[in-house]
Amino acid sequence: MAAFQIANKTVGKDAPVFIIAEAGINHDGKLDQAFALIDAAAEAGADAVKFQMFQADRMYQKDPGLYKTAAGKDVSIFSLVQSMEMPAEWILPLLDYCREKQVIFLSTVCDEGSADLLQSTSPSAFKIASYEINHLPLLKYVARLNRPMIFSTAGAEISDVHEAWRTIRAEGNNQIAIMHCVAKYPAPPEYSNLSVIPMLAAAFPEAVIGFSDHSEHPTEAPCAAVRLGAKLIEKHFTIDKNLPGADHSFALNPDELKEMVDGIRKTEAELKQGITKPVSEKLLGSSYKTTTAIEGEIRNFAYRGIFTTAPIQKGEAFSEDNIAVLRPGQKPQGLHPRFFELLTSGVRAVRDIPADTGIVWDDILLKDSPFHE
């Protein structure tokens, strides 16, 4: 069974379950609120508190469409994401405060620039969000930094999971945790499919397997996941469910976060004593890792593709100056990111392509090519 170190904690094997309190974007752009989230995570007994680092212009193209808020208001997706960026100057104060509170600071990184910024702080690990699982250039880049990597799998097919795992391993990084996850906020318990956890453990014995839970109940799915072998548990939390940000309503409040931590520790103690409890069929679901009916929409919205970042003229070579791996939002999807290195190796456009457009094969293949239908 696999194991590795995150700071002073062993993750995997017979070590205690590693509990990540996911603060995410629930700081709402307020540093004091970020400190309060760290306080809540430490007081609950979580091993780590995790934030998210991203840059809007490295996540979406400039016009990905509109997003309807809980209040029914249509807002620009790009502007919304831009407003949720965590300022770079926060990183060191948050890291120092986590040290003071004796909780490990972690962060998701969604682009190479954010990875560089986090790497400059000698991080304990990198987290890769579900919607970057197919961003193979990012996975390669982070893998080469030689830190433990945790990646989530919401909305993924098993082939996506395998390609991500294989990509990281190919760079010589074997410190990998794979998190089962469901791409719905909140996630209905009947879509938990916790049987995927032992399946992943069997399919990827060199990885540590965990569960990133988006359901609303503090203990039901997390404790069941631990009974099925999950070695990491991650769950969103907030200081107040009534705050207006996108991720507050389904997140745990501080009391519920402590309830989850206590529930997981109790479950671990029972397992050590040989006390077994059945996991409900509702939570077990299927062991087949696939994009479920409730995940298709967000997969189409958020899984990465190759997009132009500037107008490209016929005959112009593709490069990092005119294409990038981005989320489509409401735009038509571009080619899979696995083709990014191919495109930037001297391939030229066979027609004019506007900015902020998904690259398709017709942009590359000549009409008289034997590969063109």
UniProtKB/Swiss-Prot annotation:
UniProt-listed Gene3D superfamilies: Aldolase class I, Antifreeze-like/N-acetylneuraminic acid synthase C-terminal domain
Domain of life (superkingdom): Bacteria
Domain AFP-like: 305-367
Record-linked InterPro entries: AFP_Neu5c_C (IPR006190), AFP_Neu5c_C_sf (IPR036732), Aldolase_TIM (IPR013785), Neu5Ac_N (IPR013132), Nonulosonic_Acid_Synth (IPR051690), SAF (IPR013974)
The protein's annotated pathway: Spore coat biogenesis; spore coat polysaccharide biosynthesis
MF term (GO), any: N-acylneuraminate-9-phosphate synthase activity
Name this protein carries in UniProt: Spore coat polysaccharide biosynthesis protein SpsE
Lineage: Bacteria, Bacillati, Bacillota, Bacilli, Bacillales
